[in-house]
Each structure stands twice: as C-alpha cells, then as structure tokens.
C-alpha cells in the first residue's frame, strides 16, 4: 500500500485481493514465480476447427500472436499461414495448411511455463537467425543452477534488412533483442551472457574498424552489461554446457 501511495496511485480496496498465490491477469495465469497461459484459452485452441476463409485464419494468427512470448520459433512456425494471407489469393485449405495448423496447436497446448525475470540472477540471451527469421530466447538460472525460460521473441526481417551483409544482419538482431527487452536487461546485476552463431561479433564492443552505421548501432548497447559468446547449431552444444 505504501508503494502505491508513493506512486500516487489510488485503488478500490473492495476490488483488491491480498495474499493470493496465483491470479488470472490480462489472460495470463500469474503465480509468485511463474507465468502460464490461461487454461480456458488453451481449451479454445484444442477445440479450434479448420478455417473457411482468410479472415478466420487471420483471427487465429492474431490469437496465437498474443501468446507468442511462450512459443519458441513462433515466426518460423506460423510463416506459411502468414504468406497465404499476404498473397491475398483465393483461399484454399490444403495439406500444408493443415500440417502448419496442427503444428501450431501442438505448440500452443504444450507450451513452456515462463518464469519471472529476476535482476539478481545470471541471465542468458540466445540469438539465432535462420531464413531471415530472428529467434531469441531469454533465460535465467535459479538458486539451484537450473536454467528457466523467461520469454521468447521471434520476428521476420524486413525486405530491406534481408539484403544486409551477414555481419550487419547478426548485429541488427542483437540490437533488436536489447531494444525489445531493455526494461529487463538494463537492470541486471550480473553480466549477461549472449550467445550468437557468428564469431566475428565476439569482439564487437572492442572493434575499431566499424562502419559509421555500425558505430551508431553499437552506441545503443553501451548502457548494457553483457558479454558475447559463440555457439553453433552444427556443434549441437547446449547452452547449459557452455555457461557452466
């Protein structure tokens, strides 16, 4: 109550609940340490039938997009559906659409449980770019050295960005990650370990041969406490092994 008063916020005491262990807020089930999807919404996904037109498909995509923070590689999974809508062709529900639809439903139903961000815990940021789709995951170790997912982020590159040199593409998705999660990453007490599959970026903050636009981008990172580390999907190395 004191904190609310300090922030000059007023509340209706009759509508408040105190000492609860979990609560549904903005269609999320929030507990002391975790964040889940609303089970009622997940049942709606289970019961969702196929679509008769593009409008129905767009509604489903928008619904899933609301929960994309829970879904790893979201943009990659839903890419085929989005392409169908963007082309504005005559709607035809085919085998590919059915496969993507079933895949999306499985990911929604079996989604991860996210943990709340703790600025005192060690933070891991893993970044990957595949087929012009930026996929990122923010994780943290708890007191028992167990790595938990905090949030997922997935985004398609714009057309102009697809023509960038590989170094600039990778640098751009680093900038996007810190921009997207700045309110979390700026508060970390421990240096963030950021993994990316591009060795040339390891010495990014010490590189004296950056172009002008690269220097402008790097300036956006100077307020963050982080260290870039290399990882490769081809080596099939787990983040746990790299950070411990």
What are these regions (language model features)?
Residues 144-172, 176, 199-202:
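A short, polar/acidic, helix/strand-boundary loop motif
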Residues 28-33, 226-244:
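C-terminal functional segments of enzyme domains
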Residues 9, 14-121, 243:
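C-terminal reverse transcriptase regions that engage the nucleic-acid substrate
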Residues 121-129:
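Two-metal-ion RNase H-like nuclease active-site motif
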Residues 1-8, 24-34, 43-46, 160-162, ...:
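Catalytic palm subdomain of template-directed nucleic-acid polymerases
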Residues 141, 175-233, 237:
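RNase H catalytic domain
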Residues 131-140:
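Acidic, metal-ligating active-site segments
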Residues 128-132, 197:
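A short acidic Gly-Thr/Ser loop motif
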């Amino acid at each position: 109550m004191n904190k609310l008063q300090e922030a000059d916020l007023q509340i209706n005491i009759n509508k408040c609940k105190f000492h609860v262990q979990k609560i549904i807020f903005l269609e999320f089930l929030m507990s002391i340490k975790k964040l889940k999807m609303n089970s009622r919404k997940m049942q709606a996904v289970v019961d969702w039938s196929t679509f008769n037109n593009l409008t129905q498909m767009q509604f489903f995509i928008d619904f899933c997009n609301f929960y994309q923070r829970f879904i790893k590689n979201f943009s990659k999974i839903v890419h085929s559906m989005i392409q169908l809508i963007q082309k504005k062709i005559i709607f035809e529900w085919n085998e590919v659409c059915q496969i993507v639809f079933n895949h999306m439903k499985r990911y929604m139903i079996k989604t991860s449980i996210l943990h709340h961000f703790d600025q005192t815990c060690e933070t891991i940021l893993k970044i990957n770019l595949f087929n012009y789709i930026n996929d990122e995951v923010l994780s943290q170790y708890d007191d028992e050295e167990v790595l938990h997912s905090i949030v997922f982020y997935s985004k398609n590159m714009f057309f102009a960005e697809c023509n960038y040199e590989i170094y600039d593409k990778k640098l751009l998705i680093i900038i996007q990650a810190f921009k997207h999660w700045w309110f979390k990453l700026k508060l970390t007490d421990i240096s963030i370990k950021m993994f990316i599959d591009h060795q040339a970026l390891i010495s990014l903050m010490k590189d004296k041969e950056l172009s002008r636009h690269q220097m402008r981008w790097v300036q956006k990172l100077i307020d963050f406490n982080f260290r870039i580390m290399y990882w490769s999907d081809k080596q099939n190395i787990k983040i746990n092994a790299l950070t411990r």
